[in-house]
From Swiss-Prot:
This is E3 ubiquitin-protein ligase LAP. It is a multi-pass membrane protein. E3 ubiquitin-protein ligase which promotes ubiquitination and subsequent degradation of host MHC-I and CD4 molecules, presumably to prevent lysis of infected cells by cytotoxic T-lymphocytes and NK cell. Binds target molecules through transmembrane interaction. The result of this ubiquitination is the enhancement of the endocytosis of the target chain and the delivery to the lysosome, where it is proteolytically destroyed. The RING-CH-type zinc finger domain is required for E3 ligase activity.
Amino acid sequence: MSNICWICNDTCDERNNFCICSEEYKIVHLKCMQSWINYSKKVECDLCKNKYNIKKSYHYFSRWKWCFSDKKTVLSKILFIFFAVGFIFITTSMSSNVASLVTRIDDTFFDVVFLTVYISMILVTVCLCVFVLALAVDFLLDAKEKNSFLTIKEIV
């Protein structure tokens, strides 16, 4: 009787010791097991519940695949970032007007309202910068997870 890989059902001469299961489950190609682990993301054997000897690795950043699965969410994030950058640009371009306003302190109602609005815009700009930074970090962490792969080794 020939040995058959339990994943691909092809002939197999390898006996790999990935868990403590019986002999028939040790007959598996290393490539088949690698593919199965990366597809299923399981860290332990379904039968014996023994944890696999798995190492998580990442592709080089230059070879990352950028996955935009939910186009609606990505589009809304891009539009938000453009809005935030535009808002930040407008706020910083107004700074020269505020500097001249502060140097000639008139307590007119218009000046007080303008300063209040400008200070509010600065606070909103800071919040937008923090939020855009959080979006970028979230996007990069998600991309990092999608560009990871698992390698399995035999138990000793």
